[in-house]
């Protein structure tokens, strides 16, 4: 009986320690809680012309001025970093599925969080805030649909 009681106490203590020490620092929820910003949850289009994050009508994704990605043709593409031409005024943020503004950064939400940073107000740098793994860019942003 004492062994069973001791085992039960150890099990409960272990569960308490595990739940208290759990690190969720990489979760979307924590990222959004850390940022003060403006939220929008509207349409699925970001940007204008040839520079955009996601256009639901064509499924073209993340078209960069440096030519790393020209369009999305259904194949997995591991690239996540690049530059998007344009300035803040060129992008209609009211049409972004989910976003937050913080300084010169835009955090785009959806399936996973992406961080977009303005550089000299004429380029956008896309920064991956999660580990890439083997996910395609399409898999990472299709949560906008």
Segment roles from a protein language model:
Residues 96-99, 113-117, 138:
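Short, surface-exposed loop motifs enriched in S/T, G, D/E and P with embedded aromatic residues
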Residues 41, 69-74, 106-109, 122-128:
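Short hydrophobic/aromatic-rich beta-strand segments that constitute the beta-sheet cores
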Residues 51-107:
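N-terminal glycine/threonine-rich, aromatic-flanked beta-hairpin/loop signature
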